[in-house]
Design a protein with these regions (language model features):
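Short, contiguous pre-domain boundary segments
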Residues: 45-50, 319-322
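Carrier-protein-dependent adenylate-forming modules in NRPS/ANL systems
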Residues: 1-43, 64, 69, 80-82, ...
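DNA breakage-rejoining catalytic core of tyrosine-based enzymes
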Residues: 92-106, 330
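His-Asp-centered acyl/peptidyl-transfer active-site segments
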Residues: 50-65, 88, 95, 111-125, ...
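N-terminal beta-alpha "docking/capping" segments at the starts of catalytic domains
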Residues: 8-9, 41-45, 69-70, 79-91, ...
Length: 441
């Protein structure tokens, strides 16, 4: 039996309702009885009518005002370092990666939550937002998170889409201790829970955000803690258990879901493969675990001081990658080495600046032109040539061109006062000055 349900008519809570009712009905059916369930107090349509009538007037305005104030000025993009440029139109290709957190660490996270008067979700969210801040270099972090939306007892047994999405914002300053960040996240969550009834699409509408086809509005990262995982059921001789399926889609840039298992917390990382490689996400998951280990050991220390690197990564950075010695042709001039590279990879990018870029082939050709011009101006081997340019593609052309002509360049910073530049140029006894047109005089 394969049951496929569109998200427009169901949510995670509803699946558990279905399984619970199946476990009640199937044994009766097998025994030859007539399966029956208690009558529901209301239907989903009744809830929809009630919600429309309730969410208007002062109630609606209070909900809107809260979210407009809470999310005012929030960044519309979280710039995580990706492996590829972001497509102009968002894609949905994705993959999943599962990482089991150690049981001892999971217990320490629960103990920390209890000591700080926070829920497990709040503690994990605060840690995750700290990770995102470290990765992105941003301090204003907005993360989406689903909420069941079943505040009334009458709807607990209904099958339908009740879930809503909350945008949870945190100011993750590196100078904060994790305890201080957790207190902030706790207040943000409590405020969001009290105003959870405004549908997320109305929150986006109220904020009047600029449309961007390359990313989802307001947040691009989702965080989920599953408190009601699908149970394993025994009914009428049948054994039912969840079957994990590898998804090939991703709703957001990154979705991290955690759930309790008998071996500790299991994290599932769903990522957009148009942006991230599997190894990148695996590394992020390892860093999340390292961060959790650090903050549970010392929740009073500054977030910026909690290491993300494992001992193996630390050795790799400080020792293995520091071994940079390499043999090179010591008798070959640098411009000759450059020419060899230009021949090997003429189309590869050589220099990029704010005002342009050139390939190796283009840079070599321009440097050759300058070298020829310098020789016509009398530059001979070991003659000095002043090179006075701002950082640019032209600066690279100038340095290589002078070397190709056989000269030695004398670099002068154009930011120096004019009189100082004049004196230094005269002292160098240079034959020619190479500069940019806008710097003349």
């Amino acid at each position: 039996l394969l049951l496929v349900m569109h998200h427009i008519v169901t949510d995670g809570w509803s699946i558990n309702v279905l399984l619970r009712e199946l476990s009640q009905l199937y044994p009766v059916f097998v025994a030859g009885g007539v399966p029956a369930l208690p009558a529901l107090a209301i239907q989903y349509a009744d809830f929809a009518v009630w919600q429309r009538r309730w969410l208007q007037g002062e109630v609606l305005e209070a909900q809107r005002s809260y979210w407009k104030k809470t999310l005012a000025g929030a960044p519309q993009a979280l710039e995580l370092p990706a492996d590829r440029p972001r497509p102009q139109v968002q894609t949905s290709q994705g993959a999943q990666l599962s990482v089991q957190l150690p049981l001892a660490l999971s217990q320490e996270i629960r103990a920390l939550s209890h000591r700080e008067g926070a829920t497990l979700f709040m503690t994990l969210l605060a840690a995750f937002q700290a990770l995102l801040a470290r990765y992105s270099g941003q301090t204003d972090i907005v993360v989406g998170s689903p909420i069941a939306g079943r505040n009334r007892q009458e709807v607990e047994g209904l099958v339908g889409l009740f879930v809503n999405t909350l945008a949870l914002r945190a100011d993750v300053q590196g100078s904060l201790s994790f305890q201080a960040l957790l207190a902030q996240v706790r207040e943000a969550c409590l405020g969001a829970y009290a105003h959870q009834d405004l549908p997320f699409e109305q929150v986006v509408e109220a904020l009047q955000l600029d449309r961007d086809l390359s990313r989802t509005p307001l947040f691009q990262v989702m965080f989920v803690l599953e408190t009601q995982s699908a149970p394993t059921l025994e009914c009428g001789g049948l054994s039912l258990k969840p079957l994990d399926v590898d998804l090939v889609t991703a709703k957001f840039d990154l979705t991290v879901g955690l759930r309790e298992t008998g071996h500790g917390l299991l994290s599932v990382w769903e990522y957009n493969t148009s942006l991230f490689d599997r190894e990148t996400v695996a590394r992020m998951a390892r860093h999340f675990q390292t961060l959790l280990e650090g903050l549970t050991a010392r929740p009073d220390q500054q977030i910026s001081r909690i290491s993300l690197l494992s001992e193996e990564e630390r050795r790799q950075v400080l020792e293995a990658w520091a071994q940079t010695e390499a043999e090179y042709p010591r008798q070959t001039c640098i411009h000759r080495l450059f020419e060899a590279q230009a021949e090997r990879a003429a189309g590869a990018l050589a220099v990029k600046s704010l005002h342009g870029q050139v390939s190796y082939g283009e840079l070599n050709a321009q440097a050759n032109q300058l070298a020829h011009w310098l020789r016509t101006r009398g530059v001979r081997p070991e003659d000095r040539v002043v090179l006075c340019m701002e950082r640019s593609v032209e600066l690279a052309v100038g340095a290589l061109g002078i070397l190709k002509a056989g000269g030695a360049y004398v670099p002068l910073d154009p930011a120096y006062p004019a009189e100082r530049l004049k004196t230094m140029a005269e002292d160098s006894r240079a034959k020619v000055v190479v500069t940019q047109g806008r710097l003349k005089g």
